[in-house]
Amino acid sequence: MTKTTAQIAPVATLDHLVVAATTLADGIEYIAEVMGVVPQPGGKHVAMATHNALVRLSERTYLEIIAIDPAGARPSRPRWFGLDDIALQAELIERPRLIHWVARATDIARRAAACPIALGPVHVMARGDYRWRIT
């Protein structure tokens, strides 16, 4: 007997989509124009010197608008999603862009170790009181 798709637990599920912009204000304005909804304030990712705004898409999925926080201290490592990349920064001057997606998984360390491509170490991140782990 084989399991149906509904019986197989997913390894990971979509958590959120990431739209990057040169400034958070530009990203919020762009999403308001194209989606007809105004993103809500998110917060600051101090370790990455980024800040964001959010649009809820479903019960457990959202759209994140992210930009480098000009008030933040430059991080000791490259910012996530390639935000420090000069080519990406040039593209974002033209308009904000959908640049990434993020999956939610249980036991991220085990999942990352089992991945056929190197995902890098698991880091604990925070935005205000909210904490999560990411590779």
Feature roles, as predicted:
Residues 33, 65, 83-84, 133:
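Generic signature of intrinsically disordered, low-complexity segments enriched in small/polar residues
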Residues 35-36, 80, 116:
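Glycine-centered loop/turn motif at secondary-structure junctions
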Residues 2-3, 12-23, 43, 51-67, 74-113, ...:
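Vicinal oxygen chelate
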Residues 2-65, 69-74:
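Active-site-proximal cofactor/substrate-binding loop regions of enzyme domains
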